[in-house]
Amino acid sequence: MTGHPPSAAPVPHAAPTTVRDAVIDLLRQFGIDRVFGNPGSTELPMFRDFPADFQYVLGLQEAVVVGMADGYAQATGNAAVVNLHSAAGVGNAMGNLFTAFKNRTPMIVTAGQQARAILPFDPFLGATQAAEMPKPYVKWSIEPARAQDVPAAIARAYRIAMQEPRGPVFVSIPVDDWDQPADLLPPRDVSRVVRPDPAALARLGDALDAARRPAFVIGAAVERAGAWQQAVQLAERHRARVYVAPMSGRCSFPEDHPLFAGFLPAIREKIVARLDGHDLIFAFGAPAFTYHVEGFGPHVPPGATLVQLVDDPGVAAWTPEGDAVVGNLRLAALDLLARAAPPERPMPEPRAPRTRAQPPAAGERMSAAFALQTLADVRDAHDIVIEEAPSARPVMQDHLPFTQSGTFYTMDSGGLGYGMPAAVGVALAQPGRRVIGLIGDGSSLYSIQALWSAAQLRLPITFVILNNVRYAALQDFAPVFGFGPDDPVQGTDLPNLDFVALAAGMGCRGGRVSDAARLRGTLVDALRAPTPVVVEIEIA
């Protein structure tokens, strides 16, 4: 026995906080518990010891991943987190990243990068100038200078994504950063909306009050700002006809309202003709205007004044005439509604009633109008529709009305491949709600892999594919560019596609309808199914 006292047992040191720990902690602060991705080797360390309270949502191709995240973020109102595989994955995702930018969707896109130690040697899977690749279709982009800067970059990215106008942001993260030490970041409250300048808004209100026959042109930003109710109240207060802005990606006004006047085309001369007779054009949450083809002449009818209220200073800057006010649309509308009542005006004449489409004659394919009218007849007004059927959109606007907030999504970009994965994201965000993916045959093939994700997640989605065996939008548009009625339009025919077989290959039940008499029953059954179903409708 010695005279020395026994030594104390060594105290174990707590494991240092890593970049991974700090980022997961941040995501919890932001209310984010899902990551949408398609993993590669440069991303694997991010997901080691993946938290049990998080869900990884797998897409089989990166365009599907971004599309799912887009629908999810729009439906929740919070930013979605996306993880892509280095430069190749970002390249695959760029089409839907462009759409997310145009949709003003808050999204944190992360991409793996090779280890910092080998970046000087142009390594396999290394991304050269990684932060430049997604520009200009992100609000902010960075590859942090040090591993310990990654959490701060994620925090900054989230706050930028959530500031109006919202949009995607990009962070490139080297593979060896995740295990490096980093500090946890404290919670911070950063406001996301800005009230418009009171004097400028007062002048806009004066113009509305003084108008004799005002017209509202309402865009998707109204719905994104949660200003649906205020838009209705403002239109009723001013007894103004309400038109939907060209190419609007959301429904911002009930289409059964007596003041609803229909949809504006994306053609300058036709917009002017539709708005003729109004002395004030109020672009509310909308560009003035989105055009699809070249046009000439005035942007609004002669003698009419244009005023605009938007949340995007960039949109206000390029608007060719009239005064613009920039700020949060809901706060602005509340301020306008708080003004003294304007002079009494007569109610405008209501829009002519919609005509009903007729069933096809014996031996003929049914029309898109009949198919969509039948869908409208069996669909609950609360059901959510994600549409990507460009040639059928004008028909949809006549035969499939939307009357409730949060029930319609499409892409503001014109790029295909958004609709099917967005339906998956919306269904994830709205458990218990019926989601309908209304997709064209050509559109569906840009992201058909979304069916697999829907099947794996067992989501109640009814995919309605309108099969007209062609890119009908291009064939219908060809005369604008000088094609004759019998001139072939190269690359627009799509024969021999079997969407029921494609659905089965992805794990989804499917059925084909060519007989108009069977359509209603087939849709009713599909809309009751607890898991995804594909209904292929053969149309003319």
What are these regions (language model features)?
Residues 2-15, 148, 184, 302-389, ...:
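Phosphate/pyrophosphate-binding active-site segments
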Residues 2-340, 381, 460-463, 481-483, ...:
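N-terminal alpha/beta PP-like core and its mobile active-site loop of ThDP/TPP-dependent enzymes
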Residues 20-33, 38-41, 46-48, 350-432:
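Active-site diphosphate/adenylate-binding microenvironment
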Residues 73, 161, 235, 376-379, ...:
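N-terminal cationic-hydrophobic initiation segments that often serve targeting/anchoring roles
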Residues 110, 118-126, 266, 317, ...:
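Thiamine diphosphate
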Residues 158, 203-205, 230-231, 269-271, ...:
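Generic recognition of flexible, low-complexity loop/linker segments
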